[in-house]
């Protein structure tokens, strides 16, 4: 390391005590709602109710951060408070690098996180850059400032479990149970999603603090003392037809093989540990968490090797369940790839959740549409829930989701909601929300965004674009085009990331957020962005030859030159 690099490293801080929370109400810190919104959502990502490790700037997903370091965070906040409505802030891997004059309909913030030239797109190279303070892993919604806690993935997981139930169990999961692991920011959605889908679940987690948090927020119902206790509870509740979620503190790489040895038969098996990041997200069997964190710094190569070997045993157990006739699927954490790299040749024998259950929704531009109330008032979310029902009156499944969400989901940080809606519906809802702000029905503006896990915004051959009909799994032009189009359409902030969900070298993806501030100008931007964004998903799947997408494109009047209208 050069002397200059040493000086650079001494000038940044990853750990800082204190509490970050978004402001609420209508008083602005920034110059307008267009800059107040990204400021509040950045802070909301680091709210202790939202983030997994806010003192380290970690929001979720291993080391998915909101800013590169605390010095960068402070400068982002300062830049946003001073930003004018004809300027754009550029953020490079969590670091504010420039403010440029643009125009009022341009994004206020453009973000690029953890993008590497493909030949160098590996965890090894990224970790070198990260250690020098030259990069930041943004995951998907951590570095793009639109994470809303575990609710953000609950409905997607719920839709997956419901569709799996429809395919394998005649649409009825009563008396059935799901076996899974991981109760972090993403995996923490699984127990509640299973409950809402009507199934029991056994959720293995190696950190007691995560179990405590999921019980506190009502995502998990109970904790078992050990495996025997857990299986006894599962047997009792499934016999009674109750949908109860049970947590078990332990290591999935040890517990799943033991369940296979015992001949235990779940009704569904998946996994949402942070297997995408073996250095920071997957505990090797036989290790304590504290030992893992220390050795991750002192001997990273050995840690990665041990983690991948444990993943191999985990995946071999999942394969055994599948071979026993139990529906088994990867939930997008790249655990199959990690196992394959250390010798599990048939790791991909069980499918990913997108090709198995979700792709027909993507073909119609349906995906994780989300919004947050900048007022901090839950009533604003309840009013928007009612508006969704009013504007989409015939979708009983969606109405049922909204009712269950209100009853069961605890808000984390700023009140927010997610619901899976598609092309045509998103723009209709966004314009209605903007009008509610204009009329005063909502007490402050709302922001509308989505997960990067959406129909047109991601290239991820082991997850969202696995087994594409035309073989275009690894073509990453599509998320780049999505980001460019959202920028041209006037989204309030746009992000382009690499490595989210499945880790370095395995994905590229883009995100957008738009502010509904009640103005005519906002309405024009909303109409463009919330049409064009899901339309790219329909376009992408139509181009790959999916009839559902081609039909949707024709119904919606999309101008796709290579697809006859």
UniProtKB/Swiss-Prot annotation:
GO terms for biological process: L-histidine catabolic process to glutamate and formamide; L-histidine catabolic process to glutamate and formate. NAD(+) binds at residues 61-62, 139, 185-187, 205, 210, 251-252, 272-276, 282-283, 331, 501. Residues 463-472 have a biased composition (Basic and acidic residues). Its cofactor is NAD(+). Residues 453-472 are annotated as: Disordered. It catalyses: 4-imidazolone-5-propanoate = trans-urocanate + H2O. Keywords: Cytoplasm, Histidine metabolism, Lyase, NAD. It is an enzyme of class 4 (lyase). GO terms for molecular function: urocanate hydratase activity. Signal peptide: none annotated. GO terms for cellular component: cytoplasm. Pfam families: Urocanase (PF01175), Urocanase_C (PF17392), Urocanase_N (PF17391). The active site is at residue 419. Pathway: Amino-acid degradation; L-histidine degradation into L-glutamate; N-formimidoyl-L-glutamate from L-histidine: step 2/3. This is Urocanate hydratase. It comes from Pseudomonas savastanoi pv. phaseolicola (strain 1448A / Race 6). The lineage of its organism: Bacteria, Pseudomonadati, Pseudomonadota, Gammaproteobacteria, Pseudomonadales.
């Amino acid at each position: 390391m050069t002397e200059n690099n040493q000086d650079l490293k001494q000038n940044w801080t990853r750990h800082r005590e204190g509490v970050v929370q978004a402001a609420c109400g209508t008083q602005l810190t920034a110059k307008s709602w267009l800059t107040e919104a990204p400021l509040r959502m950045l802070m909301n990502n680091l709210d202790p109710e939202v983030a997994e490790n806010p003192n380290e700037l970690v929001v979720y997903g291993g080391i998915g951060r909101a800013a590169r370091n605390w010095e960068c965070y402070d400068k982002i906040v300062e830049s946003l408070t001073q930003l004018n409505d004809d300027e754009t802030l550029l953020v490079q891997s969590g670091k504010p690098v420039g403010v440029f004059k643009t125009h009022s309909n341009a994004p206020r913030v453009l973000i690029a996180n953890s993008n590497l030239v493909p030949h160098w797109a590996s965890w090894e190279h990224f970790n070198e850059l990260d250690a020098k303070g030259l990069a930041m892993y943004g995951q998907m919604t951590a570095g793009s400032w639109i994470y809303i806690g575990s609710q953000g993935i609950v409905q997607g997981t719920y839709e997956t479990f419901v569709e799996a139930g429809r395919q394998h169990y005649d649409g009825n999961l009563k008396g059935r149970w799901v076996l899974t692991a991981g109760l972090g920011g993403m995996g923490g959605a699984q127990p509640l999603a299973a409950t809402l889908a009507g199934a029991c679940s056994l959720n293995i987690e190696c950190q007691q603090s995560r179990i405590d948090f999921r019980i506190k927020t009502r995502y998990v119902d109970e904790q078992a003392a050990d495996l025997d206790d857990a299986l006894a509870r599962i047997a009792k509740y499934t016999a009674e037809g109750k949908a109860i979620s049970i947590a078990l503190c332990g290591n999935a790489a040890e517990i799943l093989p033991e369940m296979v040895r015992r001949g235990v038969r779940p009704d569904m098996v998946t996994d949402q540990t942070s297997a995408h990041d073996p250095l920071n997200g997957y505990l090797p069997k036989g290790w304590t968490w504290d030992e893992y964190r220390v050795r991750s710094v002192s001997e990273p190569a050995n840690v990665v090797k041990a983690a991948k070997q444990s993943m191999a045993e985990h995946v071999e157990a999942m394969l055994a369940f599948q071979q026993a006739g139990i529906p088994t699927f990867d939930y997008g954490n790249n655990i199959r790839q990690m196992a394959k790299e250390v010798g599990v040749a048939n790791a991909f024998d069980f499918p990913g959740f997108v090709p198995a259950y979700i792709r027909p929704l993507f073909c119609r531009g349906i995906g994780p549409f989300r919004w947050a109330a900048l007022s901090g008032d839950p009533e604003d979310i309840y009013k928007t829930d009612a508006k969704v029902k009013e504007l989409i009156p015939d979708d009983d499944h969606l109405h049922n989701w909204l009712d269950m969400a209100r009853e069961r989901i605890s808000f984390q940080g700023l009140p927010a909601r997610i619901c899976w809606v598609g092309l045509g519906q998103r723009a209709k809802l966004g314009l209605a929300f903007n009008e509610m702000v204009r009329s005063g029905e909502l007490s402050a503006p709302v922001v509308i965004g989505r997960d990067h896990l959406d129909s047109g915004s991601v290239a991820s051959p082991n997850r969202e674009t696995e087994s594409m009909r035309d073989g275009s799994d690894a073509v990453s032009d599509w998320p780049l085009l999505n980001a460019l189009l959202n920028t041209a359409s006037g989204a309030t902030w746009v992000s382009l990331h690499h490595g989210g969900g499945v880790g370095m070298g395995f994905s590229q993806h883009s995100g957008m957020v738009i502010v509904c501030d009640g103005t005519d100008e906002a309405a024009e931007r909303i109409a463009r962005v919330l049409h064009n964004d899901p339309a790219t998903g329909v376009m992408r799947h139509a181009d790959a030859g999916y009839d559902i997408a081609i039909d949707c494109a024709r119904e919606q009047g999309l101008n796709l030159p290579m697809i006859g209208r």
